[in-house]
Amino acid sequence: MRHRIAFISTIVFALAVTASAQIPAAAPIPHLEKRGAATQLIVDGKPWLALAGETDNTASSSLEYMETAWPKIVKVNLNTVLVGIGWDWVEPEEGKYDFTLVDGLLDGARKHNLRLIFLWFGSWKNGLSSFVPEWVKADQQRFPRARLKIGKPVEVLSTLSEASLNADTRAYTAFMRHLKEADTGRRTVLMIQLQNEVGLIGDSRDRSAPAEAAFARPVPPELLDYLQKNKPALWPDLLKLWEAAGARTAGTWQEVFGKSTVADEIFMAWNYSRYLDHMAKAGKAEYPLPVFTNTWLVQPQDQVPGDYPSGCPEPLVIDIWKAGAPAIDINAPDVHLRNFNDWSERFHRPNNPLFVPESYGDLGGAANAFYGIGQHAGIGYSPFGVNSPEHWAEMRPGTNTPVSNALEDLPLAKAYAVLAQMTPLITDAQAKGTIGAAWLTTQQPRRDIALGNYVVNIDIQRNRRNPVPALGYAIVVSVGPDEYFVAGRDVQILFMPNTPGPEIAGLARVETGKFVDGKWIPGRRVNGDDVVLEYDQAAAAAKNQSGSGLIFGADGPTIQHVKLYRYH
């Protein structure tokens, strides 16, 4: 009997070992990782480009409504969806949490092979405290509001309320704890946006009694230590402001930063950053997903802080946020302005990778996605309102008639399809620094990029038969001494040698094609009229040009593979 028991035990142990070997190990938690020249979002062990879209603020409050949205989202070729979760949706009664909605959103995303980024609408959404639970709204004594210079309170929780901070943190950590339990092994959720466009609207700073007392106290030493240690890398306008007041290493907010509304804005940025840092740390202790904020950008009509949310992580105060909230991984811009190239440059910094959680989804949005990812090593792009993508349709010139009613034909859908094909190539090039991009308009019709052994001249497309398009865009990847992959729409491209040797570049071979599972599949060979930009050979030769280059039309974006040669 003893031998029989030992034999059975051995068999059971062997079966258990075999079974455990067949269970796949849980994928690593999504995280940010510095790889060469880029900081990238790593998902399932590989760099991930978030070809994303954000739903309307309350779309995600109804699973029934989302059932109508998921199929549309899939047709636009997204791989990631940003969805809001309101504090009041999950904690309607204090201490009683209901994550049914969260589980339903996870299930919906998984059924459609999508990943999620949750947006925690807690203490603040668009500057206001409109998503806090009713029991918070009703108890102003326990959860005090900010006050304006006119003496009136606003529907904005004070950043200095410990009760508000603790209540929001408890709910947020319960949410993160639930995500860890519900998503371990699946990794559907990639990142968390903490709050939404924080900042005080209506005044440059909180004028409540606790806030006035805090403003009169000295600037916290940890902020001044950060500014001193990072002085060479500070945003130029912030450094100028600090130095204009004497670059003091101690003093009150007005003594250190001057008597202006900008000092008020810096004060508010510090208070918001400390509040969110506390929450982010607590959430990461439960489940360490990357965390980012989003910024309501200063609009052309805005004059002073308070016209826009004062304290929001604008370019001027991002350094304040880096000092006050080290647990926040990214300060991201919501770019609802048409000069995307300017704003992406302001937010992409060595300590701040570019992610755009809100912007346009039309043709301009397609160009934004290419430019942010290609020029600024962006980890993703996300237009707002993806649950209703019909309004992103491209119109025929001079009409209100869509070019196509099919969601798959939207400019963003086409752009995302190409970016998805090229993701392994792009993320590798981001790390190597062998990638660039162009975002062109009739006002900014050309961009030159030094890449590899050539300067790549990218112009908005011009020909005799058609008007100049309003917008053109391209991504260029160098893959060898004389070899490039280019994807774009409504652009034309010349290559100019910038290394010793023959001074004129010719096209050895050009082909269209596509990537399938990371492998290039050539299509047709391109030559003749499809590459000639200048038939006047004397004029071209005088400029050290062959007169031939790459041409991308309005049917794009498309991908071309080019090999060059040089001659005297």
Describe each region flagged by the PLM:
Residues F370-G501, T512-D517:
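Aromatic- and carboxylate-lined catalytic core of secreted/periplasmic carbohydrate-active enzymes
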Residues I458-V468, Y484-H568:
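C-terminal beta-sandwich/jelly-roll accessory domains of carbohydrate-active enzymes
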Residues A59-K75, P309-G324, W343, A369:
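Short, acidic/polar
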Residues A52-S61, G84-T100, I150-R170, V256-S273, ...:
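The substrate-binding groove and active-site-proximal loops of carbohydrate-active enzymes
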Residues Q22-L78:
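N-terminal carbohydrate-binding accessory modules
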Residues H278-L289, L316-Q421:
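Catalytic-core region of carbohydrate-active enzymes that cleave or remodel glycosidic bonds
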Residues R142-I318:
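Polysaccharide-binding and catalytic clefts of secreted carbohydrate-active enzymes
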